[in-house]
């Protein structure tokens, strides 16, 4: 419900025998729909022949029974759901990306955001390479293919490509004979794998996706690790594993991931409950009821209620048939959707002092409208509490906040923000508090650069989402 936009979810499956894998991928993607609702797609490998389909829209609308039939059988398949953080919302930017090269074919699905995609793409274009999309995923594909021409195996090519691509990426790669999963050396985005009772190996962005297809969770893929699934079993390549400290994006726990997922050993639901408990201790207020913003604020609201002793109530009802507000790129569209997405429970909040819990405030537009809804429903006070610190820095690793321009916390004090959104008071989770919601030690931790400005990698210049479109348009105008 917050105004944050994340990017994608990936899914891959390797089967020892040929079968209708697209049906399994469909269910896997359906359980990852929360990670991206702009477009989706599936690619299937049938004895080295790749079939694929992708389009704009939700999984249920794009991957129809007729599409599943046309994709046919195979023993390897990959799938993707997208919200773009580099490149616009065009069909050409939908994934998986399927490419043919002199040594065969490759399909790639990627979750994350490169910080050097512009530089790499410029190098490729200077050498005559042609790009068909404006996504950084195609930059990854070009890099792997260039390395593949020199390497003996696809996994060697991926390993060498990881020396060149910088930033956040969790990806699945399909070659004629193998399924490969790879995670960047910081582990910004989650990736895990499991195994079904039928012997299929399944890779997914979140463990909830494994559950949906009946796969038993085996483990998370480590930061910097490459895992290869093939006819000879599983191979792990850890050449890049010890290069950096793990810095998983903390918003995976706060917002992005489904509460029934386990990421890097931590249950997402428990992390959100704990965030709410800490928030209550750090930002107490006298009130009658605690209300969470559906769906992302509900678990933290339960934690706040538990720690404060203030009753929890369902004060806002979500229309489940309206997509997440952040999926609609234009601000006006997002604001219009809020009107029909949430409805206050007047009988619950009328005459009450309400504590409203959400996971973040980025621009403030959505928060202000929700506060207004509660007041119109009869709430006599609305105290907003946020289960994350103020968002004051751009994210370069997969959240669609590429500039400080629209970050309300960069422009106003907490008291001023409270006034702008119409809340009686406003409180945020502290930096120390957010570090306590998961496992943090000398070897692993969170990326909280959007809160404290300490980036785990070299700080890039601010990169705008549609930079490749702008470059193309500039070339056309010459």
Predicted features by range, described:
Residues 309-354, 365, 392-398:
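Short, glycine/charge-rich flexible loops or terminal/linker lids adjacent to PRPP-binding catalytic cores
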Residues 162, 177, 214-220, 372-478:
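PRPP-dependent phosphoribosyltransferase catalytic core
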Residues 109, 174, 182-183, 194, ...:
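Generic beta-strand/beta-sheet core signal
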Residues 1-223, 228-288, 293, 381:
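Conserved short alpha-helical segments that host acidic/polar catalytic motifs at enzyme active sites
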Residues 129, 150-151, 284-288, 306-313, ...:
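Secondary-structure transition/capping motifs at alpha-helix termini
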Residues 160, 208-209, 216-217, 221-225, ...:
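Phosphate/diphosphate-binding loops
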């Amino acid at each position: 419900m917050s105004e944050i936009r994340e990017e994608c979810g990936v899914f891959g499956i390797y089967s020892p025998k040929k079968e209708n894998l697209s049906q399994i991928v469909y269910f896997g993607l359906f359980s990852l729909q929360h990670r991206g609702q702009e477009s989706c797609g599936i690619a299937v490998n049938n004895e080295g022949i790749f079939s694929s389909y992708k389009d704009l829209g939700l999984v249920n609308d794009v991957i129809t029974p007729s599409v599943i039939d046309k994709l046919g059988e195979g023993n390897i398949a990959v799938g993707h759901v997208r919200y773009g953080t580099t490149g616009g919302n065009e069909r050409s930017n939908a994934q998986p990306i399927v490419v043919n090269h002199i040594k065969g074919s490759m399909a790639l699905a990627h979750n994350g955001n490169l910080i050097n995609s512009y530089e790499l793409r410029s190098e490729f274009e200077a050498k005559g390479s042609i790009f068909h999309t404006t996504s950084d995923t195609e930059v990854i594909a070009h890099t792997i293919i260039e390395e593949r021409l020199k390497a003996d195996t696809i996994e060697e090519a991926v390993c060498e490509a990881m020396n060149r691509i910088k930033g956040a990426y969790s990806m699945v790669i399909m070659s004629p004979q193998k399924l490969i999963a790879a995670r960047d050396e910081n582990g910004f985005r989650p990736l895990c794998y499991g195994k079904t009772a039928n012997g299929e190996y399944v890779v997914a962005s979140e463990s909830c996706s494994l559950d949906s297809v009946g796969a038993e969770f085996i483990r998370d893929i480590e930061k910097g690790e490459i895992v290869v699934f093939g006819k000879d079993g599983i191979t792990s390549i850890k050449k890049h594993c010890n290069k950096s400290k793990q810095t998983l994006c903390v918003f995976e726990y706060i917002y992005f991931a489904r509460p029934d997922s386990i990421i890097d050993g931590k249950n997402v639901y428990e992390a959100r409950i704990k965030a709410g408990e800490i928030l209550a201790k750090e930002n107490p207020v006298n009130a009658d009821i605690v209300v969470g913003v559906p769906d992302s604020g509900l678990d933290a609201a339960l934690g706040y209620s538990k720690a404060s002793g203030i009753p929890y109530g369902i004060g806002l009802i979500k229309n489940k048939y309206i997509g997440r507000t952040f999926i609609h790129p234009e601000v006006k569209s997002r604001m219009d959707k809020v009107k029909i997405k949430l409805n206050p429970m007047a009988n619950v909040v009328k005459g009450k002092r309400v504590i409203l819990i959400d996971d973040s405030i980025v621009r403030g537009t959505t928060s202000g409208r929700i506060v207004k809804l509660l007041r119109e429903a009869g709430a006599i006070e609305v105290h907003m509490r946020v289960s994350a610190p103020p968002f004051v820095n751009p994210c370069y690793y997969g959240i669609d906040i590429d500039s400080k321009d629209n970050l309300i916390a960069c422009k106003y004090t907490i008291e001023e923000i409270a006034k702008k959104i119409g809340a009686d008071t406003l409180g945020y989770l502290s930096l120390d508090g957010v570090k306590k919601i998961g496992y943090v030690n000398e070897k692993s931790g969170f990326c909280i650069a959007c809160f404290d400005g300490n980036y785990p990698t070299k700080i890039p210049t601010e990169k705008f989402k549609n930079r490749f479109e702008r470059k193309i348009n500039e070339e056309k105008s010459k």
